[in-house]
């Protein structure tokens, strides 16, 4: 039940976009088409599913105090190690997308490479570390579930945003609000709507 609660919370309650506003650059820039949003969301989710558990293992057996050697604490290296892990998997995703879906690769452009510096992915690993210290994540399986839930939460957010923006293309929006302006307003409204999930406890 704790694992299910962790999964549900990471998608709806602790949503990377609506709760923490992480990954906003690619969220706003790539959410003009549902097809493109689906592709980027899948890529981000894959990277999070792979990097969060890997960073969990690195944190538990290398970085934490007394993990490698008694009296040695390498937790100050967390940022560098996590970024290196994320960058490595981003390269794998980029090569796979370029080989198997050149059209999607061209549509995503530089934003596929920018997954490496997507703060939602980095946030997933840092929040995992925080949850480990708080006792909410206690094993690799739970870290995988948390990575999957966080990735799916971001994926859900960008696909919803893309679907709405496709509709707004045919709406009468004031010139001053077209583009990022209306996107931020819609994001705020969706964030308020997602607050309804904050009372859920499993």
Tell where the protein language model's regions lie, with residue ranges:
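Structural signature of hydrophobic alpha-helical transmembrane segments
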Residues: 5-19, 72-86, 144-157
């Amino acid at each position: 039940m704790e694992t299910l609660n962790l999964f549900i919370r990471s998608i709806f309650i602790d949503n990377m976009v609506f709760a923490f506003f992480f990954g906003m650059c690619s969220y706003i820039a790539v959410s003009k088409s549902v097809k493109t949003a689906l592709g980027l969301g899948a890529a981000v989710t894959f990277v999070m599913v792979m990097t969060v558990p890997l960073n969990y293992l690195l944190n538990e057996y290398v970085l934490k105090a007394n993990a490698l050697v008694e009296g040695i604490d390498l937790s100050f290296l967390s940022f560098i190690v996590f970024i290196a892990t994320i960058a490595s998997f981003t390269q794998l995703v980029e090569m796979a997308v370029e080989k198997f879906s050149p059209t999607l690769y061209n549509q995503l452009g530089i934003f596929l490479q920018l997954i490496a510096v997507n703060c939602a992915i980095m946030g997933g690993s840092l929040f995992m570390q925080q949850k480990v210290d708080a006792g909410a994540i206690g094993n690799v399986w739970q870290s995988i579930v948390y990575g999957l839930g966080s990735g799916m939460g971001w994926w859900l957010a960008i696909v919803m945003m893309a679907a709405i923006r496709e509709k707004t293309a045919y709406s009468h929006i004031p010139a001053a609000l077209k583009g990022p302006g209306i996107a931020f307003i819609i994001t705020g409204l969706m964030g308020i709507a997602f607050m309804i999930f904050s009372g859920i406890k499993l």
